[in-house]
A protein has these predicted regions:
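Active-site flanking residues adjacent to catalytic metal/cofactor-binding acidic residues
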Residues: 8, 34, 107, 146-148
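Catalytic metal-binding/acid-base residues of hydrolase active sites
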Residues: 11, 37, 110, 149-152
Length: 273
């Protein structure tokens, strides 16, 4: 069964109509959003407007609803398993008819504006621990982590063993885990490495920042999809989107058009489950 997913940090902009256009044109089944500007029912109405989309909102345990998740009715059920206190993480059990259950961890970590690199590393370590505990509690090792990490794939919080431990190739992730100083750490596979720069199809990253500092990457891959090794061969497609129908989400220079839309570009991916 081919399932299509979309994640977008909306930057607190009322982009529900543009979101609905993307969802319709890409035939998205599961929608995951951060930094919404309007109530979940308004987003649900936009998703279901003009066509028989039949999207349903699935609330989490944290009633602040920093994340909102929707699924096509009858296609999949998103059962809340864990929401952390700060609202940085929600973990849902994805139930599909005739398919092994998987976990979807949706995350939005603090940015480097407010957190030092050490702070981000510690937040990632806490995130990794919460996900692993939920995997143990549910007995489900098949996890997708998706969201705005506010870190690049090479950041210690993403790549190091004590944090998310996300590696750039399937060959590495196929080892399942790595032992460091007598402690075993499970891998995530990070396919976002393959979408960096201008030798890839689509934008060079998901977030652009031009800062007057000696070290400036300009393009960043803050929005990421990580998969446990058990799911990495299920990945069929992964795109950073730069349009909503006929409307471009980027400027003529290819940067996110943050004056009209979000400063983050949405990510779309498909899994054969």
């Amino acid at each position: 069964m081919l399932i299509s997913f979309l994640f977008w940090n909306l930057m607190k902009c009322p982009l529900q109509d543009h979101l609905a256009t993307i969802v319709s044109s890409h035939n998205v089944d599961i929608v995951m959003l951060a930094e919404r500007a309007v109530a979940p029912d308004e987003i649900e109405s936009a998703l279901n407007k003009g066509a028989i989309q039949d999207f349903q909102f699935f609330p989490g345990e944290n009633r602040s609803e920093k994340f909102v998740l929707f699924s096509r009715a009858g296609k999949a059920t998103l059962i809340s398993q864990f929401d952390d206190y700060s609202g940085s993480l929600t973990v849902r059990r994805l139930q599909l008819p005739g398919v092994l259950e998987i976990l979807i961890a949706v995350v939005h970590l603090p940015s480097a504006i407010n957190y030092s690199e050490v702070d981000q590393l510690l937040a990632s370590a806490k995130l990794a621990g919460d996900i692993e505990q939920t995997e143990r509690d549910t007995g489900i090792p098949r996890t997708i982590l998706v969201g705005d990490l506010n870190m690049n794939p090479f950041h210690p919080g993403v790549a190091s063993a004590g944090a998310l431990h996300a590696v750039m190739t399937k060959q590495l992730a196929a080892r399942m885990e790595r032992t460091v100083k007598g402690v075993s750490y499970r891998f995530f596979y990070n396919p976002m490495w393959g979408h960096f720069g201008d030798r890839t199809v689509g934008p060079a990253g998901t977030y652009h920042l031009s800062a007057a500092k000696p070290l400036n990457y300009f393009w960043n891959m803050y929005d990421q999809v990580l998969l446990r090794p058990e799911l990495m061969y299920s990945l069929q497609d992964l795109q950073i989107l730069d349009s909503a129908g006929i409307e471009s989400l980027v400027t003529q220079n290819g940067k996110p058009k943050s004056s009209a839309y979000s400063d983050h570009l949405p990510i779309f991916f498909q899994l054969e489950l």
